[in-house]
Amino acid sequence: MAKKIIAKIKLQLEAGKATPAPPVGPALGQHGVNIMDFCKKFNAVTADKPGMVFPAVITVYADRSFTFELKTPPASFLILKAAGIKKGSGEPNKVKVGKITKAQVEEIAKIKMPDLNARTLEAAMKIIEGTARNMGVEVVD
């Protein structure tokens, strides 16, 4: 028989830097999960990708065991990294804060493809371009 799921927790954590401090500790502690065990496993899996941010979906079972699944880094994080900027524009329609090329958009779309609800690479690229536009990042040829 399958284990009974009591919670699904979503966190965005930097690779190799999960610690029992907030936000990890309180989120997992209230469900009785061994926080250090999660931190060690997460850090081991993401150790080879320093500086990246990963969304993790942690499934907590009734016996206090857990499994976690890593998603691809957020599109906004990948766009900021590609454009070489710290944060997006406060007024994206008026103030442009950076530029990325179509090739960079395609690269980001390839990375994000498993998590996007797009069937083709072109559709995924349009999603990424829209995200970039909403952040005040210009897409150039």
Curated annotation (Swiss-Prot):
Post-translation changes: One or more lysine residues are methylated.
Pfam families associated with the record: Ribosomal_L11 (PF00298), Ribosomal_L11_N (PF03946)
GO biological process: translation
Coiled-coil regions listed: none
PANTHER family: 60S RIBOSOMAL PROTEIN L12, LARGE RIBOSOMAL SUBUNIT PROTEIN UL11M
Protein family membership: Belongs to the universal ribosomal protein uL11 family.
Protein name (database record): Large ribosomal subunit protein uL11
Organism whose genome encodes this protein: Kosmotoga olearia (strain ATCC BAA-1733 / DSM 21960 / TBF 19.5.1)
Classification lineage: Bacteria, Thermotogati, Thermotogota, Thermotogae, Kosmotogales
